[in-house]
């Protein structure tokens, strides 16, 4: 599975910069506003729509933008994907892995987190990239709908302050409430030496809107 995952990642990266990946690349650059540098740093790619899996069926990532998920040391854990087209049947799809054990882009942000002694957690992968693209490189993503104590414990190795910048919609507010309950339940300041700081976003906006 690991070899296959690496092959798909390599194919996706190579295809994104080819004529076949132009539509996906245009979306990332023009619609999302990401520079080539950000796209390269995060290892984004595109799997051609005609690619099949080992059984001859259409590959699960075919025709999708691929985002690699790494552990804090840069080891590839899983592949996530997004179909950016308006009428997409399934907007997001990812391999099975324990999302609550990882933080998106921690491998990229780790040194900046250590240097500043603080981290910023946002909800979506593209939110993380937007933060990094405007120079806020201590941002990571929570890879799911709720923050876990495992993720906080992971960050406590590198910093003492965590800012939560979640979406301004109802789901984002619910995620914020859950995260703050962890603060009380586990006594994060006392036992993890971590200060959790919530940051309110304007209604129905997320960090990627700025």
Predicted regions and their residues:
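Short phosphate-binding/catalytic loops that engage adenosine nucleotides
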Residues: 33-34, 136, 194
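Conserved phosphate-handling catalytic cores of large alpha/beta enzymes
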Residues: 156, 162-210
């Amino acid at each position: 599975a690991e070899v296959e995952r690496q092959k798909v990642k390599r194919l996706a990266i190579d295809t994104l910069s080819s004529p076949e990946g132009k539509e996906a690349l245009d979306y990332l650059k023009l619609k999302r506003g990401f520079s080539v540098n950000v796209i390269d740093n995060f290892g984004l790619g595109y799997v051609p729509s005609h690619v099949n899996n080992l059984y001859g069926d259409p590959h699960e990532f075919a025709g999708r933008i691929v985002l690699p998920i790494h552990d804090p040391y840069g080891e590839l854990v899983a592949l996530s994907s997004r179909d950016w087209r308006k009428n997409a049947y399934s907007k997001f799809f990812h391999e099975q892995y324990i999302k609550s054990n990882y933080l998106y882009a921690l491998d990229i942000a780790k040194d900046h987190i250590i240097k500043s002694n603080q981290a910023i957690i946002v909800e979506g992968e593209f939110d993380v990239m937007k933060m990094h693209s405007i120079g806020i490189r201590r941002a990571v993503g929570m890879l799911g709908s709720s923050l876990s104590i495992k993720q906080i414990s992971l960050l406590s190795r590198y910093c003492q302050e965590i800012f939560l910048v979640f979406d301004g919609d109802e789901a984002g507010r619910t995620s914020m409430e859950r995260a703050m309950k962890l603060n009380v339940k586990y006594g994060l300041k006392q036992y993890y030496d971590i200060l959790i700081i919530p940051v309110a976003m304007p209604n129905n906006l997320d960090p990627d809107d700025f």
